[in-house]
From Swiss-Prot:
GO terms for molecular function: flavonol-3-O-beta-glucoside O-malonyltransferase activity; malonyltransferase activity. Monomer. The keyword Acyltransferase applies. It comes from Nicotiana tabacum. This is Phenolic glucoside malonyltransferase 1. The gene is mat1.
Length: 453
């Protein structure tokens, strides 16, 4: 559990713009009904409560306020028309703020940062819920970001983030976190804030010659009864586990695939890692005792940053969502067999390869239809990316000891988190949330398979 020390609202620092409104693009609309994103960073820092209250809390509030001067929409709200007659938008006005909770916990810090299976419910004490939406003339206003900082006396600190995906994708949120970390580490000296952390807000760079925005918005309105502006969370009865796949093992997996399929052209660290996890997940299902349909379809889905796929490319610091989805699918029996891993690599690689530089495909909106025939309960999806390095977020206390993607706990299917390893360049860190039985079976297969490479 966590007891509250202080709950406050942090506003952007003086000198910030008085208002900012960003229309949602078709890249944003698709996330309106999506569950909230939750991440926790754990830092080893052996400090006492008095030090936490007297030094850590004031500096974090000051640096967050300064960071929000650059990231105004995160202090604002998503404004959704109550009659659904117009597009939603991100809206900031003077006085808007981010809810921040400072708390203290006596839970075992070393247990939480472990790699072994841990109860998923334990982590929800350290991520905040977004405040309830409020009615305003003609619209409903829902906050898009909340933060919780928790002290584990004489052991460490965690920083939990909850955000509405409609505000921005992983690239946007990670840049915000790293900007905050830099300003906190260097005492608010803005000269340390490199251009890559200064958001680009011009939404006119998102081209829409085919009216994709209207098409997707009309499609999303069909599901408005499913869109909950409230942040409702029920922690599932699962365990969380973390697995490391080394650069050396990734190289062996690539060689294994290319020995069997020498003509494959998109064999990357991402494709072999995801394919290996996918096949281990499929094979672990037998341990649950549930009936398995060998001819049933299995799905793999991932979202990729498409900023560089436009002509001209969007700025890397573009604020918002710029993701397109890739889907691979095949029968259960194909993945469970001896050639399952190779088949998975080929399917995932081909799904990405044929679309990775296809601006026309993006502008046609076809990527939105990729998920139409996906059975969510038979799917594995990916959260995070090795390209987004939250382990680089140093608030002045050193690199994080552990990163947890709490939002992979959803019950619709199985999600895996994927990030750089904190300890070694080229190694990847995989997070999973499964039933205890399934996790044990997965861990055995994951370890056994790697040992025979």
């Amino acid at each position: 559990m966590a007891s509250v020390i202080e709950q406050c609202q942090v506003v952007p620092s003086p000198g910030s713009a008085t208002e900012l409104t960003l229309p949602l693009t078709y890249f944003d609309h698709v996330w309106l009904a999506f569950h909230r994103m939750r991440r926790i960073l754990f830092y080893k820092l052996p400090i006492s409560r008095p030090d936490f209250v007297q030094t850590i809390i004031p500096t974090l509030k000051d640096s967050l306020s300064l960071t929000l001067k650059y990231y105004l929409p995160l202090a604002g709200n998503v404004a959704c028309p109550q009659d659904w007659s117009g597009y939603p938008e991100l809206r900031y006005v003077t006085g808007n703020s981010v809810s921040v909770i400072f708390s203290e916990s006596d839970m075992d810090f070393n247990y939480l940062i472990g790699y072994h299976p841990r109860n998923t419910k334990d982590f929800y004490h350290f991520v905040p819920q977004l405040a309830e939406p409020k009615d305003a003339p003609g619209v409903q206003l829902a906050p898009v970001l909340a933060i919780q900082v928790t002290l584990f006396p004489n052991h460490g600190i965690s920083i939990g983030f909850t955000n509405h995906h409609v505000a921005g994708d992983g690239a946007t949120i990670v840049k915000f976190v790293r900007a905050w970390a830099l300003l906190n580490k260097f005492g608010g000296d803005e000269q340390f804030l490199a251009n890559e952390f200064i958001p680009f807000y011009d939404r006119s760079v998102i081209k829409d010659p085919n009216g994709v925005g209207m098409s997707i918005w009309n499609e999303m309105k069909k599901y408005k009864h499913m869109m909950k502006m409230s942040d409702v969370v029920t922690p599932p009865d699962k365990v969380r586990g973390t697995f490391i796949i080394t650069r050396h093992d990734i190289g062996k997996l690539k060689n294994l695939v290319l020995t069997r399929r020498p003509k494959l052209t998109h064999v990357t660290s991402f494709t072999v890692t995801c394919a290996y996890v996918w096949t281990c997940i499929i094979k672990s299902e037998a341990a649950t005792g549930e009936e398995i349909d060998e001819n049933g379809m299995e799905f793999f889905g991932c979202a990729a940053d498409c900023r560089a796929q436009f002509n001209p490319p969007l700025p890397p610091s573009y604020f918002g969502n710029a993701l397109v989805g890739y889907v691979a699918r095949t029968r259960q029996v194909d993945l469970a067999g001896k050639e399952g891993f190779t088949i998975a690599v080929e399917l995932i690689g081909e799904a990405i390869r044929k679309r990775m530089k296809d601006e026309e495909w993006i502008l046609s909106g076809s990527w939105f239809k990729e998920y139409d025939k996906v059975d969510a309960k038979r799917s594995l999806s990916v959260a995070g990316s090795p390209k987004l390095d939250l382990y680089a977020a140093d608030f002045g206390w050193g690199r994080p000891e552990k990163l947890e993607f709490v939002s992979i706990d959803n019950d619709d299917g199985i999600s895996m988190s994927l990030s750089k390893s904190k300890d070694s360049d080229g190694d990847l860190e995989i997070g999973l949330s499964l039933s205890k039985t399934r996790m044990n079976a997965f861990a055995a297969m994951f370890t056994h398979g790697i040992s025979f490479l």
